[in-house]
């Protein structure tokens, strides 16, 4: 995007030209973007995302492409509130490069991004039928495992959970050591 003033954004919204101020970034499978809070952003058609964010129950809709809700009316915009917290200065492309992973005993892990609220790791597990990988939970915060490819099984004292692409597993804080096996790629979100 480019630097702009609050008034320029308001005018662009009224005239339907807000997209002229935004930086368009083509996306491809496995891309990672870290978008800081307050950054005006949109997700283009056809993109499937895993959106991990700081704990907040607020989303301000600044522009909505004139879409309508189930009631047939345009959805509510929150222009004033959004502009109070928006960062209107230009920024470099938020794409983060993925690094090459090295496998060790059936698992590879890399830190994808980190901020003061969370860390996101990419983990690849590739085990044979009788081989497992041990997973240690955090002592003070729960973790989220989001399966983004393949399938696997998590074993714990109380049983097993089989998970597939799109499934999410919450691991309570101070959990026992878990065993994971299968051929699976997941995001390990640590709060």
Description of each model-found segment:
Residues 177-191:
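Short, basic/aromatic-enriched C-terminal tail that caps enzymatic domains
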Residues 127, 173, 182:
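Residues on the solvent-exposed faces and adjacent turns
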Residues 163-177:
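Low-complexity, intrinsically disordered Gly/Pro/Thr-rich segments
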């Amino acid at each position: 995007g480019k630097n702009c003033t609050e008034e320029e954004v308001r005018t662009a919204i009224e005239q339907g030209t807000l997209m002229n101020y935004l930086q368009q970034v083509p996306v491809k499978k496995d891309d990672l973007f870290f978008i800081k809070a307050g950054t005006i952003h949109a997700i283009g058609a056809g993109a499937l995302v895993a959106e991990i964010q700081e704990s907040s129950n607020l989303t301000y809709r600044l522009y909505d492409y004139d879409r309508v809700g189930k009631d047939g009316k345009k959805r509510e915009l929150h222009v004033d509130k959004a502009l109070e917290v928006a960062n209107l200065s230009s920024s470099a492309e938020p794409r983060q490069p993925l690094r090459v992973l090295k496998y060790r005993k059936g698992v590879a892990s890399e830190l994808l991004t980190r901020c003061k609220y969370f860390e996101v790791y990419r983990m690849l597990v590739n085990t044979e039928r009788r081989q497992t990988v041990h997973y240690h939970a955090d002592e003070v915060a729960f973790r989220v495992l989001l399966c983004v490819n393949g399938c696997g099984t998590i074993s714990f004292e109380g049983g097993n959970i089989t998970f597939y692409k799109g499934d999410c597993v919450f691991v309570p804080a101070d959990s026992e050591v878990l065993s994971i096996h299968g051929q699976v790629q997941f995001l390990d979100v640590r709060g």
